[in-house]
Amino acid sequence: MLKVSKYVTGVVQTNVYFCYDDETRACVIIDPAANAPHIIRIIEEELHLKPEAILLTHGHFDHIMAAKDVAQHFGIKIFACADEAETLADPKRNLSGNFGVEVTLQPGEYETFRDGDTLHHLGREWKVLETPGHTPGSCCFYIADGLSFQPEGATEPKIYSVLFSGDTLFKESFGRTDFVGGSQEAIVKSIVEKLLVLPADTSVFPGHEAQSSIGNEQKYNPAVFLGRVNL
């Protein structure tokens, strides 16, 4: 059974996710934002996990600051969208320069994937959905058979799909598009055409703030109205 644990850290309160197999303790880390020593301590001492990969939803500094240190500590690889290379490599584009630091990931320091690729972790298929708009190479990760939950009175558990949406889709909102490389038109198109077409009971784990579901976003996300669609 897969489980998801969240740790909030950094100057803009970024959600770091640990998606793991409850039996094997194998783990995928999504967006190790900051405070590498504490992330490592949570993994080793609190959750007792065995990381096998780091996945990045996009290249802004508040989602990648701890990536290299965590990857080196556990001897694992970092994966990011190929179209996010410029953001990852440039402190101005990834916004770290705005805070007086230079955080970068250069080509060769991470592996790449593209839209439509399927990653294999924790015995599941993770579909890459490239969702430009917040940044040119923003992406989300979709697991069709993600979480198992047995409602009260049910004889069998129900399987829920999972979406790690980064800063593309938030609860009843979406990511900022006023940074370098951002586009409101692109993010609305990404959300409407790639995310809101997923099953309504899909659990959405965003890069900031509270969890949601696709069904909730189909009703209340402003992208629905900005995209002039009727879902």
Where do the model's predicted regions map?
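Conserved beta-strand hairpin/beta-sheet module of binuclear metal-dependent hydrolase folds
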Residues: 1-47, 140-150, 156-157, 161-164
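Conserved S/T- and glycine-rich ATP-binding loop of Class I adenylate-forming
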Residues: 19, 57, 131
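Active-site HxH/HxHxD metal-binding segment of metal-dependent hydrolases
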Residues: 27, 34-125, 146-150, 219-227
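Hydrophobic residues in well-ordered beta-strands that form the structural core
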Residues: 30, 78-80, 165, 206
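Hydrophobic residues at beta-strand termini and immediately following loops
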Residues: 7, 113, 131
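Metallo-beta-lactamase
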Residues: 25, 94-95, 125-231
